[in-house]
Amino acid sequence: INEVWYGDTTYGPYITIDGKKHRVYIIALIDDASRKITACEAFLEDNYISLMKVIKSGISSCGKPKLFSFDNGANYRSNQMTLLGARIGVAINYCPAYTPTSKAKVERFFLTLKNQYLCLIKPNDYHDLDTFNKDLRAYIQKYNTTPHSSLEDNMSPNDRFYKESNIIIEMSQEKIEKS
């Protein structure tokens, strides 16, 4: 666990805020070995600030990985990301362009998220991002505790992740916030 975390962004549904429809962007990090979603949140903007919030959340709750693997999107491939990796001691890998198979686990999670949850949402179901994120967190909790057919003994992502909890490298909240 915490060897590689894959990160990516997907389009979420439209939600209506103050009478206007807004596209939601969902950023997720997934642990390669356990399939645990270490962090996931929806935003109205797909940018580095949003990505940083997700990374800090993941490290706060699950420790730090040895490697982040991202696609080549602008918010992932930035000088700020290089500096972040150096500050916290995490290597950063960028997948070759137009090769979704190089980050297949996060892409598969997004497909599951869309087929099981996002497809049910209508634009008028949500009127603020906080409520949407609350429900998204509930879905992630369910996902992380559901047995996964590709894991040993059909373990859940959480069970697989915490089976090796002794190797989690935690960071102080102060260091996370300074990153």
Label every model-predicted segment.
Residues I1-A28, K36-I37, Y48-S57, S61-K66, ...:
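Mobile-element integrase/transposase regions
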Residues A39-E41, L67-D71:
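Short catalytic-loop micro-motif centered on adjacent basic/acidic residues
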Residues T9, D32, N72:
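Residues immediately flanking
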Residues D31, F43-N47:
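A short acidic/small-residue loop/turn micro-motif
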Residues I59-C62, G89-I92, L113, Y117-I121, ...:
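A generic secondary-structure signal for well-formed alpha-helical elements
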Residues N144-S179:
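C-terminal, beta-rich DNA-binding module of retroviral/retroelements integrases
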Residues R35-C40, N93-C95:
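Short small-residue beta-strand/loop micro-motif enriched in glycine and branched aliphatics
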Residues F70-N72, Y76-I88, I92-L118, H127-N133, ...:
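RNase H-like two-metal-ion nuclease catalytic core shared by retroviral integrases
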